[in-house]
Regions:
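Terminal low-complexity/charged segments
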Residues: 12, 31-65, 69, 113, ...
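PAPS-dependent sulfotransferase catalytic domain
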Residues: 1-35, 41-92, 97
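The conserved 3'-phosphoadenosine-5'-phosphosulfate
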Residues: 20-31, 79-138
Length: 141
């Protein structure tokens, strides 16, 4: 994300590529969104806010803080992807499935290491707090 919002355009440019639809429980998705993306849009970073607002309004929903509307839009988006993506290129995947479905779709062996758990809410909040820090001067490095 946010590139996933442009999957039709990306797939048009790379028609042989697989489309990985990452799904999760709608309530879990909302909890993550309301703890990461929504607070970030309310931050003082105007560039971030403009990007999120434009993306949500053009590709998703304008009522970003409306839980029910956002969940409905999330679920409708997943239905739309499943209905419009070429079945031969679509991989529907949930993080708890790990490497298996992705590696199978790509005809690759499953790595001998656990599937990474990254981009958590705490990771996002740390990234966001670092973005909100003033830039370091050359003398601080």
């Amino acid at each position: 994300w946010p590139a996933s919002s442009f999957w039709p355009e990306i797939h048009a440019a790379f028609p042989d590529a697989k489309i990985i639809l990452s799904e999760r429980d709608s309530e879990a998705w909302w909890r993550s969104m309301s703890n990461t993306i929504i607070p970030a849009t309310l931050s003082a970073d105007n560039d971030w806010r403009r990007m999120i607002d434009a993306l949500f309004k053009s590709r998703f929903i304008s009522a970003i803080e409306d839980k029910n509307a956002c969940i409905a839009a999330y679920e409708a988006n997943n239905v739309r992807v499943r209905a419009t993506a070429p079945a031969s290129h679509l991989v529907t995947w949930r993080a708890e499935q790990g490497w298996g479905p992705i590696c199978a779709a790509l005809n690759l062996p499953v790595p001998d290491e656990p599937f990474p758990h990254v981009n958590t809410t705490s990771d996002f909040k740390e990234w966001q707090s670092q973005r909100n820090q003033p830039p370091k001067s050359a003398g601080d490095q």
